[in-house]
Protein backbone atom coordinates (compact mmCIF):
# COMPACT_ATOMS: atom_id res chain seq x y z
CA UNK A 1 0.00 0.00 0.00
CA UNK A 2 1.44 3.38 -1.03
CA UNK A 3 2.20 5.79 1.81
CA UNK A 4 0.61 9.15 1.16
CA UNK A 5 2.99 12.03 1.82
CA UNK A 6 2.12 14.13 4.86
CA UNK A 7 1.43 17.67 3.70
CA UNK A 8 2.80 20.67 5.65
CA UNK A 9 -0.72 21.77 6.55
CA UNK A 10 -1.33 18.42 8.27
CA UNK A 11 1.34 18.79 10.99
CA UNK A 12 2.47 21.44 13.44
CA UNK A 13 5.21 23.36 11.64
CA UNK A 14 5.97 25.71 14.54
CA UNK A 15 5.64 26.17 18.29
CA UNK A 16 4.92 29.43 20.09
CA UNK A 17 5.39 29.89 23.83
CA UNK A 18 3.98 33.07 25.39
CA UNK A 19 5.69 34.85 28.27
CA UNK A 20 3.35 37.71 29.19
CA UNK A 21 5.60 39.68 31.55
CA UNK A 22 7.09 43.14 30.96
CA UNK A 23 9.15 45.53 33.04
CA UNK A 24 6.76 48.27 31.95
CA UNK A 25 3.90 48.33 29.45
CA UNK A 26 4.61 50.45 26.36
CA UNK A 27 2.05 53.16 25.62
CA UNK A 28 1.04 51.68 22.25
CA UNK A 29 0.86 48.01 23.29
CA UNK A 30 -2.44 46.11 23.25
CA UNK A 31 -0.89 42.63 23.48
CA UNK A 32 -1.55 40.24 26.36
CA UNK A 33 1.33 41.45 28.49
CA UNK A 34 1.54 42.62 32.08
CA UNK A 35 3.93 44.63 34.24
CA UNK A 36 4.28 44.44 38.01
CA UNK A 37 4.48 40.68 38.60
CA UNK A 38 7.13 39.56 41.10
CA UNK A 39 9.64 36.73 40.88
CA UNK A 40 7.36 34.20 42.58
CA UNK A 41 4.57 34.81 40.07
CA UNK A 42 7.05 34.30 37.24
CA UNK A 43 8.18 31.00 38.75
CA UNK A 44 4.57 29.90 39.28
CA UNK A 45 3.82 30.76 35.67
CA UNK A 46 6.84 28.77 34.50
CA UNK A 47 5.63 25.74 36.46
CA UNK A 48 2.14 26.12 34.98
CA UNK A 49 3.45 26.22 31.40
CA UNK A 50 5.64 23.19 32.08
CA UNK A 51 2.56 21.35 33.34
CA UNK A 52 0.60 22.33 30.23
CA UNK A 53 3.47 21.00 28.09
CA UNK A 54 3.44 17.70 29.99
CA UNK A 55 -0.34 17.34 29.76
CA UNK A 56 -0.21 17.85 26.00
CA UNK A 57 2.79 15.55 25.43
CA UNK A 58 0.82 13.32 23.05
CA UNK A 59 0.59 16.22 20.58
CA UNK A 60 4.36 16.14 20.07
CA UNK A 61 3.80 13.20 17.72
CA UNK A 62 2.22 15.66 15.29
CA UNK A 63 5.22 18.01 15.24
CA UNK A 64 6.97 18.25 11.89
CA UNK A 65 10.68 17.49 11.90
CA UNK A 66 12.66 20.64 12.73
CA UNK A 67 9.53 22.68 13.51
CA UNK A 68 10.48 26.21 14.57
CA UNK A 69 10.38 27.39 18.19
CA UNK A 70 9.49 30.94 19.25
CA UNK A 71 9.44 32.43 22.76
CA UNK A 72 7.47 35.69 22.55
CA UNK A 73 5.70 38.11 24.81
CA UNK A 74 5.57 40.37 26.62
CA UNK A 75 9.28 40.26 27.22
CA UNK A 76 10.63 36.71 27.57
CA UNK A 77 13.99 38.06 28.73
CA UNK A 78 12.46 39.40 31.98
CA UNK A 79 12.09 35.79 33.15
CA UNK A 80 14.97 34.49 35.28
CA UNK A 81 17.28 32.47 33.04
CA UNK A 82 16.62 29.34 35.10
CA UNK A 83 12.91 29.68 34.25
CA UNK A 84 13.67 30.02 30.55
CA UNK A 85 15.90 26.95 30.83
CA UNK A 86 13.13 25.02 32.59
CA UNK A 87 10.67 25.83 29.79
CA UNK A 88 13.16 24.95 27.05
CA UNK A 89 14.06 21.68 28.73
CA UNK A 90 10.39 20.72 29.15
CA UNK A 91 9.80 21.21 25.43
CA UNK A 92 12.81 19.04 24.65
CA UNK A 93 11.88 16.39 27.22
CA UNK A 94 8.42 15.86 25.72
CA UNK A 95 9.56 15.95 22.10
CA UNK A 96 8.25 19.36 21.05
CA UNK A 97 11.71 20.89 20.49
CA UNK A 98 13.63 18.80 18.01
CA UNK A 99 17.07 20.05 17.04
CA UNK A 100 18.35 21.31 14.72
CA UNK A 101 15.65 23.91 14.22
CA UNK A 102 15.19 27.65 14.13
CA UNK A 103 14.65 28.74 17.74
CA UNK A 104 13.94 32.42 18.36
CA UNK A 105 13.55 34.39 21.57
CA UNK A 106 12.39 38.00 21.88
CA UNK A 107 14.56 40.26 24.03
CA UNK A 108 14.12 43.84 25.18
CA UNK A 109 17.49 45.62 24.84
CA UNK A 110 17.03 47.00 28.35
CA UNK A 111 17.07 43.47 29.81
CA UNK A 112 20.08 42.12 27.90
CA UNK A 113 23.52 41.38 29.31
CA UNK A 114 26.27 39.11 28.01
CA UNK A 115 25.78 36.35 30.61
CA UNK A 116 22.04 36.11 29.90
CA UNK A 117 22.57 36.08 26.13
CA UNK A 118 25.24 33.38 26.42
CA UNK A 119 22.85 31.26 28.50
CA UNK A 120 20.10 31.68 25.90
CA UNK A 121 22.49 30.63 23.15
CA UNK A 122 23.59 27.57 25.16
CA UNK A 123 19.95 26.50 25.57
CA UNK A 124 19.64 26.15 21.80
CA UNK A 125 18.21 29.51 20.76
CA UNK A 126 19.95 30.35 17.50
CA UNK A 127 17.98 33.47 16.57
CA UNK A 128 17.23 36.53 18.66
CA UNK A 129 14.73 39.32 18.03
CA UNK A 130 15.23 42.71 19.68
CA UNK A 131 12.43 45.23 20.15
CA UNK A 132 14.57 48.21 19.16
CA UNK A 133 11.67 50.34 17.77
CA UNK A 134 13.84 53.46 17.38
CA UNK A 135 17.40 54.66 17.89
CA UNK A 136 16.32 58.12 19.04
CA UNK A 137 16.09 58.56 22.80
CA UNK A 138 13.29 61.13 22.67
CA UNK A 139 11.15 58.78 20.56
CA UNK A 140 11.83 55.85 22.88
CA UNK A 141 10.86 57.90 25.94
CA UNK A 142 7.68 59.10 24.24
CA UNK A 143 6.57 55.48 23.80
CA UNK A 144 7.47 54.34 27.32
CA UNK A 145 10.33 52.09 26.22
CA UNK A 146 12.73 51.11 29.01
CA UNK A 147 15.92 51.16 26.92
CA UNK A 148 18.03 53.87 25.33
CA UNK A 149 19.43 53.97 21.81
CA UNK A 150 22.89 53.18 23.17
CA UNK A 151 21.58 50.17 25.09
CA UNK A 152 19.96 48.86 21.90
CA UNK A 153 23.21 49.13 19.93
CA UNK A 154 25.14 47.50 22.78
CA UNK A 155 22.61 44.65 22.96
CA UNK A 156 23.04 43.93 19.25
CA UNK A 157 26.82 43.78 19.71
CA UNK A 158 26.52 41.57 22.80
CA UNK A 159 24.29 39.14 20.92
CA UNK A 160 27.04 38.69 18.31
CA UNK A 161 29.57 38.18 21.08
CA UNK A 162 27.30 35.58 22.70
CA UNK A 163 27.29 33.55 19.48
CA UNK A 164 24.05 34.60 17.78
CA UNK A 165 24.57 34.63 14.02
CA UNK A 166 20.91 35.40 13.32
CA UNK A 167 19.70 38.68 14.80
CA UNK A 168 16.51 40.58 14.04
CA UNK A 169 15.27 44.00 15.13
CA UNK A 170 11.82 45.58 15.15
CA UNK A 171 11.34 49.23 14.21
CA UNK A 172 8.27 51.48 14.24
CA UNK A 173 7.65 54.52 12.06
CA UNK A 174 5.03 57.21 12.63
CA UNK A 175 6.13 57.77 16.24
CA UNK A 176 5.50 60.99 18.18
CA UNK A 177 8.27 63.53 17.47
CA UNK A 178 9.64 61.33 14.68
CA UNK A 179 10.78 63.05 11.48
CA UNK A 180 12.06 61.77 8.16
CA UNK A 181 15.55 62.80 9.27
CA UNK A 182 15.36 60.93 12.58
CA UNK A 183 13.93 57.84 10.89
CA UNK A 184 16.74 57.82 8.34
CA UNK A 185 19.29 58.17 11.13
CA UNK A 186 17.74 55.17 12.92
CA UNK A 187 17.83 53.10 9.72
CA UNK A 188 21.45 54.08 9.03
CA UNK A 189 22.68 53.28 12.53
CA UNK A 190 20.80 50.00 12.66
CA UNK A 191 21.94 48.70 9.27
CA UNK A 192 25.52 49.79 10.03
CA UNK A 193 25.58 47.07 12.72
CA UNK A 194 25.49 44.39 10.00
CA UNK A 195 22.06 43.12 11.02
CA UNK A 196 20.42 40.90 8.39
CA UNK A 197 16.74 40.96 9.38
CA UNK A 198 14.52 43.95 10.17
CA UNK A 199 10.77 44.17 10.77
CA UNK A 200 9.26 47.62 10.27
CA UNK A 201 5.72 48.52 11.32
CA UNK A 202 3.68 51.68 11.04
CA UNK A 203 2.45 52.83 14.44
CA UNK A 204 -1.17 51.85 15.04
CA UNK A 205 -3.10 53.66 17.75
CA UNK A 206 -5.11 50.84 19.29
CA UNK A 207 -8.31 51.69 21.14
CA UNK A 208 -8.00 51.34 24.90
CA UNK A 209 -4.23 51.89 25.05
CA UNK A 210 -2.62 54.77 26.97
CA UNK A 211 -1.40 56.11 23.63
CA UNK A 212 -4.97 56.38 22.32
CA UNK A 213 -5.98 58.35 25.40
CA UNK A 214 -3.02 60.73 25.08
CA UNK A 215 -3.72 61.31 21.40
CA UNK A 216 -7.42 61.95 22.09
CA UNK A 217 -6.49 64.51 24.74
CA UNK A 218 -4.04 66.25 22.41
CA UNK A 219 -1.09 65.51 24.68
CA UNK A 220 0.71 63.57 21.95
CA UNK A 221 0.87 64.58 18.31
CA UNK A 222 1.63 62.02 15.63
CA UNK A 223 3.07 62.67 12.15
CA UNK A 224 0.35 63.61 9.68
CA UNK A 225 -0.84 61.20 6.99
CA UNK A 226 1.42 62.61 4.26
CA UNK A 227 4.50 62.44 6.48
CA UNK A 228 3.68 58.86 7.50
CA UNK A 229 3.38 57.96 3.80
CA UNK A 230 6.78 59.57 3.15
CA UNK A 231 8.22 57.54 6.03
CA UNK A 232 6.85 54.36 4.46
CA UNK A 233 8.53 55.24 1.15
CA UNK A 234 11.78 56.06 2.95
CA UNK A 235 11.83 52.64 4.62
CA UNK A 236 11.31 50.87 1.27
CA UNK A 237 13.94 52.81 -0.65
CA UNK A 238 16.54 52.87 2.13
CA UNK A 239 16.44 49.16 2.91
CA UNK A 240 16.41 48.26 -0.78
CA UNK A 241 19.55 50.35 -1.32
CA UNK A 242 21.18 48.62 1.66
CA UNK A 243 20.61 45.22 0.07
CA UNK A 244 17.56 44.09 2.02
CA UNK A 245 14.87 42.03 0.28
CA UNK A 246 11.30 42.79 1.20
CA UNK A 247 9.96 39.26 1.55
CA UNK A 248 6.77 40.20 3.42
CA UNK A 249 4.79 43.42 3.83
CA UNK A 250 6.65 44.39 7.02
CA UNK A 251 9.77 42.18 6.90
CA UNK A 252 13.14 42.62 5.22
CA UNK A 253 16.12 40.29 5.04
CA UNK A 254 19.62 40.06 3.62
CA UNK A 255 21.21 36.83 2.41
CA UNK A 256 17.96 34.88 2.70
CA UNK A 257 17.75 35.30 6.48
CA UNK A 258 13.95 34.99 6.52
CA UNK A 259 12.07 34.17 9.71
CA UNK A 260 11.09 30.54 9.25
CA UNK A 261 8.70 30.77 12.19
CA UNK A 262 6.73 33.72 10.87
CA UNK A 263 6.70 32.13 7.43
CA UNK A 264 4.67 29.28 8.95
CA UNK A 265 2.02 31.84 9.93
CA UNK A 266 2.04 33.45 6.49
CA UNK A 267 1.77 30.05 4.79
CA UNK A 268 -1.20 29.37 7.10
CA UNK A 269 0.27 26.11 8.32
CA UNK A 270 -0.50 24.64 11.76
CA UNK A 271 1.36 25.73 14.89
CA UNK A 272 1.00 24.75 18.51
CA UNK A 273 1.03 27.27 21.35
CA UNK A 274 1.58 27.19 25.11
CA UNK A 275 0.95 29.76 27.82
CA UNK A 276 -1.61 32.34 28.88
CA UNK A 277 -3.32 33.98 25.88
CA UNK A 278 -1.19 31.91 23.50
CA UNK A 279 -3.01 31.18 20.25
CA UNK A 280 -2.48 27.96 18.28
CA UNK A 281 -3.95 26.70 15.02
CA UNK A 282 -4.30 23.05 13.98
CA UNK A 283 -5.43 23.65 10.41
CA UNK A 284 -9.15 23.62 11.26
CA UNK A 285 -9.60 25.41 14.56
CA UNK A 286 -7.96 28.08 16.68
CA UNK A 287 -7.19 27.41 20.33
CA UNK A 288 -6.43 30.35 22.65
CA UNK A 289 -5.32 29.99 26.27
CA UNK A 290 -6.85 31.83 29.21
CA UNK A 291 -5.79 35.46 28.97
CA UNK A 292 -5.04 36.36 32.58
CA UNK A 293 -1.89 35.08 34.23
CA UNK A 294 -3.42 34.23 37.60
CA UNK A 295 -6.42 32.46 36.09
CA UNK A 296 -4.10 30.44 33.86
CA UNK A 297 -1.87 29.44 36.79
CA UNK A 298 -4.80 28.47 39.02
CA UNK A 299 -6.46 26.43 36.29
CA UNK A 300 -3.28 24.44 35.64
CA UNK A 301 -2.85 23.84 39.37
CA UNK A 302 -6.32 22.26 39.45
CA UNK A 303 -5.46 19.68 36.78
CA UNK A 304 -4.19 16.28 37.83
CA UNK A 305 -1.80 14.14 35.80
CA UNK A 306 -3.43 13.15 32.52
CA UNK A 307 -6.32 15.56 33.05
CA UNK A 308 -6.58 18.41 30.56
CA UNK A 309 -10.06 19.90 30.39
CA UNK A 310 -9.67 21.91 27.23
CA UNK A 311 -12.95 23.74 27.75
CA UNK A 312 -11.61 25.11 31.04
CA UNK A 313 -8.22 26.22 29.73
CA UNK A 314 -8.88 27.26 26.13
CA UNK A 315 -11.29 29.10 23.94
CA UNK A 316 -11.69 26.91 20.85
CA UNK A 317 -12.92 28.49 17.64
CA UNK A 318 -14.06 26.21 14.83
CA UNK A 319 -13.41 27.85 11.46
CA UNK A 320 -15.64 27.34 8.43
CA UNK A 321 -14.16 26.53 5.04
CA UNK A 322 -14.92 30.10 3.94
CA UNK A 323 -13.12 31.52 6.98
CA UNK A 324 -10.14 29.24 6.42
CA UNK A 325 -9.84 30.34 2.79
CA UNK A 326 -10.21 33.99 3.79
CA UNK A 327 -7.38 33.76 6.32
CA UNK A 328 -5.23 31.70 3.95
CA UNK A 329 -5.44 34.46 1.33
CA UNK A 330 -4.93 37.26 3.87
CA UNK A 331 -1.76 35.64 5.18
CA UNK A 332 -0.38 34.42 1.86
CA UNK A 333 -0.75 37.78 0.15
CA UNK A 334 1.40 39.37 2.84
CA UNK A 335 4.39 37.54 1.36
CA UNK A 336 6.19 39.01 -1.64
CA UNK A 337 5.91 35.70 -3.48
CA UNK A 338 2.19 35.63 -2.77
CA UNK A 339 -0.39 32.97 -1.97
CA UNK A 340 -0.25 29.52 -3.55
CA UNK A 341 -3.48 28.99 -5.45
CA UNK A 342 -2.50 25.36 -6.05
CA UNK A 343 -2.44 24.83 -2.29
CA UNK A 344 -5.74 26.70 -1.92
CA UNK A 345 -7.27 24.31 -4.44
CA UNK A 346 -5.93 21.25 -2.64
CA UNK A 347 -6.83 22.40 0.88
CA UNK A 348 -10.15 24.13 0.28
CA UNK A 349 -11.31 22.73 -3.06
CA UNK A 350 -11.69 26.16 -4.63
CA UNK A 351 -10.35 27.83 -7.77
CA UNK A 352 -9.54 31.28 -6.39
CA UNK A 353 -9.21 32.99 -9.78
CA UNK A 354 -12.60 31.66 -10.82
CA UNK A 355 -14.37 32.12 -7.47
CA UNK A 356 -13.29 35.78 -7.16
CA UNK A 357 -13.03 36.64 -10.87
CA UNK A 358 -15.24 39.74 -10.77
CA UNK A 359 -13.57 41.11 -7.63
CA UNK A 360 -10.03 40.49 -8.92
CA UNK A 361 -10.54 41.92 -12.42
CA UNK A 362 -10.22 45.62 -11.45
CA UNK A 363 -7.22 44.82 -9.24
CA UNK A 364 -5.42 43.20 -12.19
CA UNK A 365 -6.38 46.18 -14.35
CA UNK A 366 -4.97 48.65 -11.80
CA UNK A 367 -1.81 46.51 -11.50
CA UNK A 368 -2.32 46.04 -7.77
CA UNK A 369 -2.04 42.25 -8.05
CA UNK A 370 -0.25 39.84 -10.39
CA UNK A 371 -0.52 36.12 -11.12
CA UNK A 372 2.41 33.87 -12.03
CA UNK A 373 1.09 30.87 -13.97
CA UNK A 374 4.39 28.99 -13.62
CA UNK A 375 4.21 28.98 -9.80
CA UNK A 376 0.42 29.35 -9.54
CA UNK A 377 0.87 32.19 -7.07
CA UNK A 378 -1.20 35.34 -6.72
CA UNK A 379 0.75 38.25 -5.25
CA UNK A 380 0.50 41.93 -4.45
CA UNK A 381 2.57 44.31 -6.56
CA UNK A 382 4.61 47.05 -4.88
CA UNK A 383 1.64 49.37 -5.36
CA UNK A 384 -0.67 46.68 -4.04
CA UNK A 385 1.33 46.35 -0.83
CA UNK A 386 0.57 49.99 -0.06
CA UNK A 387 -3.17 49.23 0.00
CA UNK A 388 -2.98 45.60 1.11
CA UNK A 389 -5.79 45.84 3.67
CA UNK A 390 -8.22 47.04 1.00
CA UNK A 391 -7.27 44.15 -1.28
CA UNK A 392 -7.64 41.59 1.51
CA UNK A 393 -11.30 42.59 1.86
CA UNK A 394 -11.96 41.01 -1.55
CA UNK A 395 -11.66 37.58 0.07
CA UNK A 396 -14.16 38.21 2.87
CA UNK A 397 -17.07 35.89 2.13
CA UNK A 398 -20.27 37.09 3.78
Which residues does each PLM region occupy?
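C-terminal scaffold of the Radical SAM
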Residues: 4-12, 33-59, 65-350
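Auxiliary N-terminal substrate/complex-recognition segments of SAM-dependent methyltransferases
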Residues: 14, 227, 358-360, 389
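Minor-groove-contacting beta-hairpin "wing" of winged helix-turn-helix DNA-binding domains
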Residues: 376-381
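Local cysteine-cluster metal-coordination motifs and their immediate loop/turn environment
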Residues: 20-33
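Short, amphipathic alpha-helical interaction segments positioned at domain boundaries
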Residues: 383-398
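Conserved N-terminal Rossmann-fold NAD(P)-binding element of oxidoreductases
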Residues: 17
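A short, conserved structural fragment
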Residues: 364-374
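Short amphipathic alpha-helical interaction segments
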Residues: 350-364
Amino acid sequence: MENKQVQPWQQYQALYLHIPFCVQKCLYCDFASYAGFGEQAKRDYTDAVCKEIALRAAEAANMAANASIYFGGGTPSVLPTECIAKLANALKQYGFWQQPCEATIEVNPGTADLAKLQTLRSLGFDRISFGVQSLQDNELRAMGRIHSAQQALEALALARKAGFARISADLIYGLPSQTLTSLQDTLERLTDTGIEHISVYGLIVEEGTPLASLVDKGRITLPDEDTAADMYELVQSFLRERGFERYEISNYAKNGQYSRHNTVYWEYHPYIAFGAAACGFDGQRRRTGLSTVREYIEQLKSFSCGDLRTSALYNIEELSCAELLEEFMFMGLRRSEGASLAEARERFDVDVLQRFASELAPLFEQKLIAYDASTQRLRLTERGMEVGNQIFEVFVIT
